[in-house]
């Protein structure tokens, strides 16, 4: 029979010291905490944590080793109207656990009770935590530390990126091992991206509703254990080290790794959801609750983590440090990041945001906010503090509207092209703060954006009610991928115009994986539950010419000084000149009155020509000898100081020097 010693209150979670394992769990309102350990026959032994330091319950188990499976039972009042939902009949996961054994299944036995305790024991069907050892040989690994103004982000899903790649060994496709395979590294470096932003790799659970439909949470935003590397994306049985191998391989190629992390809600969902972890450990501390103990739902996922509580702030900060120090990641993208600044109203001076900003162990990390949630005052674009960058939906929507609908002025276009200075040039923020994107995992792919006017999400099992209807897409005359050659050519021209705009805008460009390959999701703009060939990239059918075009754009971006400077463009600094199609400065009327033709002179030498009109037009070029710059088509060179721009066309010219 194992016996617990007193142990210590830090660090939280299960910590192996070479001789045994220390366990520490936060709970302010609990009256009794039991550590539950399980042998290979699933036999449970309960050990009471009698030592308590403040609100931390702790104990030390001598001779315990990595691989030990465990959980907790936490007892205390069950008073839902007071926010108290303790239930010792439910085996609970350690919120700081580094590994999960098993999977959270759809079973009513996991329900802790709505108005009264559910007394069915959940241990037999509940997944278990696993003690891990974190030693690893990083060799000479170094963070690439790519400067923000030199960063090009590539957003991808581990499985979606690698599952169908024919040159990756079949037994590792769709995994972290595939991500670090030389074939994938070579592809990313040849494309020219500098940072790989991964959809969640934190251990997640599939919602009961999806399990009932035979679907999975493909994206992974239903996070269960934020400290644990998701087992479902590992080729082998050691997800942590497999992930670290991939990070090390990417770093050797100079590619940063940014993780999409979820701290706004948990996998316990609403009051009818399962009791898996925080709800049973300390419901009042971990969640935002109403006056009668009801869950606030500013996330749309049933609950909201209370990120202004000191203990919850410490938990998040410990988690970020784990991924930074143990896994060597280079940055984080925070899902529904307004929640991080709620007190409950949003403030840029919120304690968690301040902790991230000032933590010495996170210095050099790239921090990216998705600056909204669905609560009151949830839209906070431009309001996050330095050093955060932010996903810009204004950039996405305005650029889509300019090219695909023609209802955005040149003034609005120019503001987005210039890193949305009207939004971000405040509070000492720099142009990199605008994460410019046309598409992302949620929404249409670029090919679908020019092929569908309406979403087609029936496969999600929600009657096509899910996903946004505000897409600003344009199918160019026919709904769906199949169309005549004229429509297909116009769609390709629109894709190239949008991609050129994205890559050559000031700010930080983010490219959705597959957009450079012509990937389609058949019009599904909310493919969160499609873990299949709908979302996986089809490498063998890829548009290689489009990929080469995008790689050329990224290379071109690197050669233009105006796009490599850290500071804002200023009038007269030589970085940018805005010209009409006659080659003259735009008049106030032209800025705001329906013009769709524009010349942008960058660094005095690169001339970006935009004809977003539905009609061809002549552009009078500034003085000098101009030639078409790669990767643009040299079959339409300027003649006699004039460029003949086709409808919905874009081109970059370079001024020849003597």
Curated annotation (Swiss-Prot):
Gene Ontology terms describing biological process: glycogen catabolic process
Pfam families for this protein: Alpha-amylase, CBM_48, GlgX_C
Site (Transition state stabilizer): 442
Keyword Transport attached: no
InterPro entries: GlgX_C (IPR040784), GlgX_Isoamylase_N_E_set (IPR044505), Glyco_hydro_13_cat_dom (IPR006047), Glyco_hydro_13_N (IPR004193), Glyco_hydro_b (IPR013780), Glycogen_debranch_bac (IPR022844), Glycogen_debranch_GlgX (IPR011837), Glycoside_hydrolase_SF (IPR017853)
Domain of life: Bacteria
Example of a GO MF term: glycogen debranching enzyme activity
Pathway(s) per entry: Glycan degradation; glycogen degradation
Active site: 335 (nucleophile), 370 (proton donor)
Bias (Basic and acidic residues) ranges: 457-468
Listed EC numbers: 3.2.1.196
Recorded catalytic activity of this chain's protein: Hydrolysis of (1->6)-alpha-D-glucosidic linkages to branches with degrees of polymerization of three or four glucose residues in limit dextrin
Regions crossing the membrane: none
Keyword Hydrolase: yes
SMART domains: Aamy
Region: Disordered, residue numbers: 457-478
Keywords attached to this entry: Carbohydrate metabolism, Glycogen metabolism, Glycosidase, Hydrolase
Function per UniProt: Removes maltotriose and maltotetraose chains that are attached by 1,6-alpha-linkage to the limit dextrin main chain, generating a debranched limit dextrin.
Family: Belongs to the glycosyl hydrolase 13 family.
PANTHER family: GLYCOGEN DEBRANCHING ENZYME
Protein name: Glycogen debranching enzyme
Origin species: Pectobacterium carotovorum subsp. carotovorum (strain PC1)
